[in-house]
Curated annotation (Swiss-Prot):
Residues 348-430 are annotated as: Required for macropage invasion. It is found in: Nucleus. It comes from Homo sapiens. Pfam families: Chromosome_seg (PF13889), DUF4210 (PF13915). Coiled coil: none annotated. This is Atos homolog protein B. The gene is ATOSB. GO terms for cellular component: nucleus. SMART domains: DUF4210 (SM01177).
Length: 538
């Protein structure tokens, strides 16, 4: 057996004792010790052994390699820190022994320092540890190997004691004695292949001296080798198989507690892999919420003729909704002709005076100075009153045609009861301009003898210009509105009749009655509501 020390220290004289193995003599303060045996026996053609060790803390002088006598057959005791050399042969299985660096049958080199030993066969790394539990707590342990020893820093993070011949674990587990074929070591070149960068996880305790837990590669974590997620492996190729995936395919990652990955369903092929970007444990709970193409659900009723009819009816109901979304212009087919519209629109016919009376037109200006004198006659004659008139004019024509004026007489200054009139009689309203000239005198005859108490109604008196000879059956389109008077009547709870609210008038700028050359005549029309004629007070 030949040994090579990576970092030798100055040699020192060994103590007297039995025959030493043919190795370099001297205390090793820290480094790497490798050995090679060309003829390892029938069981192994070649043996490589590697030992990584470091000096204990608090030592000032180098330790010397000595041979130690076999201890007595007492219980497990503390492992001495002093230098010593012992032989592995003849020791009982339960007692700790010195570190053996030679073959299974040859003597071993005892190093009185904390060290790590590996036996390599092929590309598997096996770590050997001691079974003495007291040696973990007694004494001051040495720090990890110096940074110069790259193999120690990259393979382990803590020191281990030497193993016993029986291969007992450090926690008392006894998986059985290791066979001699497992105690091979690795050469320097092969050992460099086992070194990995970064931190390596601490080896499990009590697994028969193995750096990694001995599990069946097919059942690790309940997964098959193809579904085992990539992670930090043991030094050297691990027996776990890894499947090489194409560049465009993502690996199937699943939780350790969920067991083997189930077969993907047909409907989930369109969804992206949810476990690539988030926790795999939550994947079964929210992956169905991701948007994706939905597969049509087959309904057993669709196979029969009745199912096809229902489907067709559903499409007919949804077709108008789709056309509404596209736009109103697509509702009618392009071949259908549009509805013919009349040349002259009559939708606003009769609404012009209503719009003026209700003030829907924007006024162009106001004129002050108009007044109105109100009087009535009948069973009694109330006193005449004169009230101001608010006059507003409008610009509703592009030509120079005269625009009507709107006058409003407010009756609120007369009191809450308004202007009292008899139930049957005549109302006279005379309009004066700012020059106190009569613009128009309105005479309206009324009969509200049948009007119940607490009701109201109105009268609308119009003056039209109609062609001569058509007074009785004049066409409404041939009539021209000249004046309009709107009166509101109300009966009190006692049955007394009065004018209330306001009085509204429509008139023109100039008097059309003076134009004698026109072939038209004035026609008065008084209208009242009917069906119902009277309405109750609010």
């Amino acid at each position: 057996m030949r040994h090579v020390q990576a970092e030798p220290s100055p040699s020192s004289e060994p103590e007297a004792g039995p025959s030493q193995p043919p190795v370099r003599q001297g205390a090793l303060q820290g480094g790497l010790l490798m050995g090679y045996s060309p003829a390892g026996g029938a069981t192994s053609p070649g043996v490589y052994q590697v030992s990584i060790f470091s000096p204990p803390a608090g030592t000032s002088e180098p330790h010397r390699a000595l041979k130690r006598q076999a201890p007595s057959t007492e219980g497990p005791r503390e492992l001495k820190r002093g230098p010593g050399l012992g032989a592995r042969e003849g020791l009982p299985p339960e007692e700790p022994s010195t570190v053996g660096l030679l073959g299974p049958e040859g003597p071993g080199l005892g190093l009185g320092v904390a060290s790590q030993h590996f036996s390599h066969r092929g590309l598997c790394v096996v770590e050997q540890r001691s079974s003495v539990t007291s040696s973990w707590t007694s004494g001051a342990w040495s720090p990890p190997c110096p940074p110069s020893n790259a193999s120690c820093n990259t393979l382990h993070t803590r020191d281990w004691a030497s193993p016993d011949p029986g291969g007992q674990g450090s926690l008392g587990e006894s998986p059985g004695p290791a066979p001699p074929g497992q105690l091979h070591t690795l050469d320097t070149d092969l050992h460099s292949l086992a070194q990995i960068g970064g931190k390596s996880p601490v080896a499990g305790v009590g697994n028969g001296g193995s750096l990694w837990p001995r599990e069946s590669p097919g059942t690790a974590n309940g997964h098959s080798p193809e579904h085992t997620p990539p992670g930090p492996g043991p030094p050297g190729p691990c027996p776990t198989k890894r499947r090489l995936l194409p560049a465009g395919e993502a690996p199937d990652v699943s939780s350790e507690e969920e067991g083997p990955a189930p077969r993907r369903r047909r409907g989930s092929l369109g969804h992206p892999t949810a476990a690539n970007s988030s926790d795999a444990k939550a994947t079964p709970f929210w992956s169905h919420l991701l948007p994706g193409p939905k597969e049509p659900v087959l309904d057993p009723t669709d196979c029969g003729p009745m199912g096809r009819r229902l489907k067709g009816a559903r499409r007919l109901k949804l077709s108008p909704l789709r056309s509404l979304r596209k736009g109103p212009g697509l509702l009618s087919p392009p071949s259908a002709s549009p509805v013919p519209t009349p040349a002259v629109s009559r939708t606003l016919l009769g609404n012009f005076e209503e719009s003026l009376l209700r003030g829907r037109f924007a006024p162009s200006g106001h004129i002050e100075g108009f007044t109105a004198e109100i009087g009535a006659s009948g069973s009694y004659c109330p006193q005449h009153v004169t009230l101001p008139v608010t006059v507003t004019f409008f610009d509703v024509s592009e030509q120079n045609a005269p625009a009507p004026f709107l006058g409003i007489v407010d009756l609120n200054p007369l009191g809450r009861k308004g202007y009292s009139v008899p139930k049957v009689g005549t109302v006279q309203v005379t309009l004066f301009n700012p020059n106190q000239t009569v613009v128009k005198m309105f005479l309206v005859t009324f009969d509200f003898s049948d009007m119940p108490a607490a009701h109201m109604t109105f009268l609308r008196h119009r003056l039209f210009l109609v062609p001569v000879g058509e007074e009785g059956n004049a066409n409404p389109t041939h009539r021209l509105l000249c004046y309009l008077l709107h009166l509101r009547f109300r009966s009190s709870r006692s049955g007394r009749l009065s004018l209330h609210g306001d009085i509204r008038l429509l008139f023109s700028r100039r008097s059309l009655e003076l134009d004698t050359g026109l072939p038209y005549e004035l026609q008065a029309v008084t209208e009242a509501p009917h069906n119902p004629r009277y309405s109750p007070l609010p």
